[in-house]
């Protein structure tokens, strides 16, 4: 009874203090974590705000994000002896990496004779020669070592009869620079490679003494004189603000699929890292390259396999017509993914979509015999019932083109250091690193090959840790930081917490998503994109009129969703404006009015006698986009692609050619 | 003080009360309509066992396993490719993308 009374007394005092006492007094209450061990040097400061308690922490390195790349970087740094903090808004095993169930590519040579240089060629070709060949060289050369390292950490890859890692054919991989047939390079863990990777890395990271700050939402970078000195974050559990001062900051926050109405990403994929970097005045690279899949279930966002169409499924518009016959008379529904996506989008734009909003089409499978369907595609009736609520033997599945991956992100060099481009040269931003889907090294270029993104995570997560270990030593004294650093972020937080306009966060978000889905999706032409840019500008301005409802500070999800919407907006405007400016078709960015690739030479003809086009007139270059957060205006610059590999003798660079499969 | 008492009784009794309510609702819903009037109406369906937490775990092990569409290979070894510990069911990459249960996981 005494214990219960004591517990209820504590409960009671917490209830009272939140309602009746003014905000200033809350600075004296107990913080939710106890300061012990290495966290002993966390100090409360009032230099930033006298309304919000701000706690200062000092570390050697801070990693923002705890997915595959973030965890690899965090424990790589701890292993090297750095005092590392990992700040994440989700529990590490809930990051979106857990949903990546495909395999991981590596030229181990277990199924046939293989060479990482052939993997290098496939990746360069897949990126449509927009990938930086030094980064691709680094990734494919490190791939076998990375996979073996994961296996040594305990990741249970599937095995062949003699105990080697089993590799299967997947993701456009070939032998002998495209001339030797299909390569078997994809390693997997039963059906859940990403899940297993994340759990393996998390388990491994607990061996080292990384300090995890779970459910801390990173607000902004602390930049001073062009150098990154740390991160400021909101603790969602008790509403306190924390400044993590560190000499090295690694951003591994993932992609921004949620800018589109239909995407396979979790609700938490909101491009926080890209937005933090944009607000710091640094560029983001190649954001217009977004990978789509034609048949994603409407509303749910999971993708239906191409096998459905391979087994005889057909795409139907509102008139019941098999519209693919018009767009691809020979291949019909088995045309390539981008043709199918574009045809579906054209049908929807011309008003022949289905549903109350006429914004998707139907995938019909009920004309196939049910036993054949169950035998060839086991589990599809379950999938259709769970995600679409339809009985696949009676009704069609509603589908529309869906976003799956963002090739673009924060520009880095092959070592993982964030770069800016000034006066014709790459300049490293001291103290800032990026890896994973948030970074753009750029290995995927204009199009990502299957099973390469999990490899990207581990290789560049490790690369960031190695670069920091090379440049820096643990325990170095931190350079002084202004006492009011992070003031603007806290002011913005306060403004969003008490926002009292007229449109809710969810309405503005839906407007943005629908605009992006109809204007910046698969079907891109000049008029559609320009119209989209104008609409996005007005949606951006409507953020000034936002209304939030929850005025508390403890676990205020309304506030966090609003901050995430601000981040999504910055990503969305950069995506659509970069797409409008790029007047060519390359990889995932396909335009109807400019159907060809525009390189410095015309590679479909012999090079002799051709005049090299100047940098301004061709499009084999990276887009760097800057945004002014006040107005939402985007400025674009361009940066050349790195065409030389790290070691020309070891691995010759691949000269550009026409990409055909 | 009354507020605190309400809070602590609510906190303590909440878990047990919820289970209690659930079990009464279950049994109440399962009684056929004419039960109270005591007529000769036959039960259309047999009375189901109330799903108390204990009863729930008494479900047959085999019942849940047979519902799984993708069968386990014997010893987890794929008979055609001799892959140990690989994906269940047909080869996921047979259509060019990574397929599982009709969903495309990677492409």
Curated annotation (Swiss-Prot), chain A:
The active site is at 337 (proton acceptor). The keyword Flavoprotein applies. It is a peripheral membrane protein. It comes from the Eukaryota. Its cofactor is FAD. Residues 1-39 form a transit peptide. Its main location: mitochondrion. Pathway: Carbohydrate metabolism; tricarboxylic acid cycle; fumarate from succinate (eukaryal route): step 1/1. It catalyses: a ubiquinone + succinate = a ubiquinol + fumarate; (R)-malate + a quinone = enol-oxaloacetate + a quinol; (S)-malate + a quinone = enol-oxaloacetate + a quinol. Its EC number is 1.3.5.1, 1.1.5.-. It is found in: Mitochondrion inner membrane. InterPro entries: FAD-dep_OxRdtase_2_FAD-bd, FAD/NAD-bd_sf, FRD_SDH_FAD_BS, Fum_R/Succ_DH_flav-like_C_sf, Fum_Rdtase/Succ_DH_flav-like_C, SdhA/FrdA/AprA, Succ_DH/fumarate_Rdtase_cat_sf, Succ_DH_flav_su_fwd. GO terms for molecular function: electron transfer activity; flavin adenine dinucleotide binding; succinate dehydrogenase (quinone) activity. One of its GO terms (biological process) is mitochondrial electron transport, succinate to ubiquinone. Oxaloacetate binds at residues 293, 337, 404, 448, 451. Enol-oxaloacetate inhibits the succinate dehydrogenase activity. One of its GO terms (cellular component) is respiratory chain complex II (succinate dehydrogenase). Belongs to the FAD-dependent oxidoreductase 2 family. FRD/SDH subfamily. Flavoprotein (FP) subunit of succinate dehydrogenase (SDH) that is involved in complex II of the mitochondrial electron transport chain and is responsible for transferring electrons from succinate to ubiquinone (coenzyme Q). SDH also oxidizes malate to the non-canonical enol form of oxaloacetate, enol-oxaloacetate. Enol-oxaloacetate, which is a potent inhibitor of the succinate dehydrogenase activity, is further isomerized into keto-oxaloacetate. This is Succinate dehydrogenase [ubiquinone] flavoprotein subunit, mitochondrial. It comes from Danio rerio. The gene is sdha.
């Amino acid at each position: 009874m005494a214990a219960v009374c004591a517990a209820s007394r504590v409960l009671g005092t917490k209830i009272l203090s939140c309602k009746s006492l003014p905000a200033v007094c809350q600075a004296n209450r107990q913080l939710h974590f106890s300061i012990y061990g290495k966290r002993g040097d966390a100090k409360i400061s009032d230099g930033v705000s006298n309304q919000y308690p701000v706690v200062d922490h000092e570390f050697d390195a801070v990693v923002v994000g705890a997915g595959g790349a973030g965890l690899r970087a965090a424990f790589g740094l701890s292993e090297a002896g750095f005092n590392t903090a990992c700040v994440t808004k989700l529990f590490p095993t809930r990051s979106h990496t857990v949903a990546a169930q495909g395999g991981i590519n590596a030229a181990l040579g277990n199924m046939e004779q293989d060479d990482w240089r052939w993997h290098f060629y496939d990746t360069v070709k897949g990126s449509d020669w927009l990938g930086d060949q030094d980064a691709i060289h680094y990734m494919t050369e490190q791939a076998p070592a990375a996979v073996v390292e994961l296996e040594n950490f305990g990741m249970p890859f599937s095995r062949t009869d003699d105990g080697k890692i089993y590799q299967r054919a997947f993701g456009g991989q070939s032998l002998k620079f495209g001339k030797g047939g299909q390569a078997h390079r994809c390693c997997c863990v039963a059906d859940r490679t990403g899940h297993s990777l994340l759990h393996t890395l998390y388990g491994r990271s607990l061996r080292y003494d990384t300090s995890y700050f779970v459910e801390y939402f990173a607000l902004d970078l602390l930049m001073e004189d062009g150098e990154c000195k740390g991160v400021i974050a909101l603790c969602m559990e008790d509403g306190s603000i924390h400044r993590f001062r560190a000499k090295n900051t690694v951003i591994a926050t993932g992609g921004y699929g949620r800018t589109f109405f239909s995407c396979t990403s979790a609700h938490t994929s909101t491009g926080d890292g890209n937005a933090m970097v944009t607000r710091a005045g640094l560029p983001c690279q190649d954001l217009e390259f977004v990978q789509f899949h034609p048949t994603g279930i409407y509303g749910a966002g999971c993708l239906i396999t191409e096998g459905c169409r391979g087994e005889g499924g057909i795409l139907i518009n509102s008139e019941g017509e098999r519209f693919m016959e018009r767009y691809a008379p020979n291949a019909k529904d088995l045309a390539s993914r981008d043709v199918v996506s574009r045809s579906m989008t054209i049908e929807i734009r011309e008003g022949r979509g289905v549903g109350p909003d006429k914004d998707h089409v139907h995938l019909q499978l009920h004309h196939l015999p049910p036993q054949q369907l169950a035998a060839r595609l086991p589990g599809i009736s379950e999938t259709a019932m769970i995600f679409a609520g339809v009985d696949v033997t009676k009704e069609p599945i509603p589908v529309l083109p869906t976003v799956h991956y963002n090739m673009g992100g924060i520009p880095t060099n092959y070592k993982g250091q964030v770069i800016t481009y000034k006066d014709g040269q790459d300049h490293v931003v001291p103290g800032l690193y990026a890896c994973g889907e948030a970074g753009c090294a750029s290995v995927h270029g204009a199009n990502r090959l299957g099973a390469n993104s999990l490899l990207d995570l581990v290789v560049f997560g490790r690369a960031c840790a190695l670069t920091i270990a090379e440049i820096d030593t643990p325990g170095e004294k931190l350079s002084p930081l202004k006492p009011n650093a992070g003031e603007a972020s806290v002011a913005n937080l306060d403004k969003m917490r008490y926002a009292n306009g007229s449109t809710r966060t969810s309405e503005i978000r839906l407007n943005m998503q629908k605009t992006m889905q109809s204007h910046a999706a698969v079907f891109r032409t000049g008029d559609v994109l320009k119209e989209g840019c104008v609409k996005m500008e007005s949606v951006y301005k409507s953020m000034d009129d936002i209304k939030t409802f929850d005025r508390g500070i403890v676990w205020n999800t309304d506030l966090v969703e609003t901050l995430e919407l601000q981040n999504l907006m910055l990503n969305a405007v950069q995506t659509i404006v970069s797409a409008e400016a790029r007047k060519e078709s390359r990889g995932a960015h396909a335009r109807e009015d400019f159907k060809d690739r525009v390189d410095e030479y015309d590679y479909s003809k012999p090079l002799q006698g051709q005049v090299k086009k100047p940098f301004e007139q061709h499009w084999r270059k990276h887009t760097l986009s800057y945004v002014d957060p006040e107005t939402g205006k985007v400025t674009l610059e361009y940066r050349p692609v790195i065409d030389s590999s790290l070691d020309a003798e070891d691995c010759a660079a691949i000269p550009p050619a026409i990409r055909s499969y | 003080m009354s507020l605190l008492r309400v809070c602590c009784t609510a906190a303590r009794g909440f878990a047990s009360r919820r289970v209690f309510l659930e079990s009464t609702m279950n049994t109440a819903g399962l009684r056929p309509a004419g039960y109270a009037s005591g007529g000769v109406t036959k039960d259309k369906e047999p009375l189901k066992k109330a799903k108390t937490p204990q009863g729930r775990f008494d479900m047959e092990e085999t019942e849940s396993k047979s519902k799984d569409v993708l069968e386990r290979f014997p010893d987890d070894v794929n008979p055609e490719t001799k892959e140990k510990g690989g994906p269940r069911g047909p080869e996921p990459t047979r259509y060019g993308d990574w397929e599982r249960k009709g969903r495309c996981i990677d492409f």
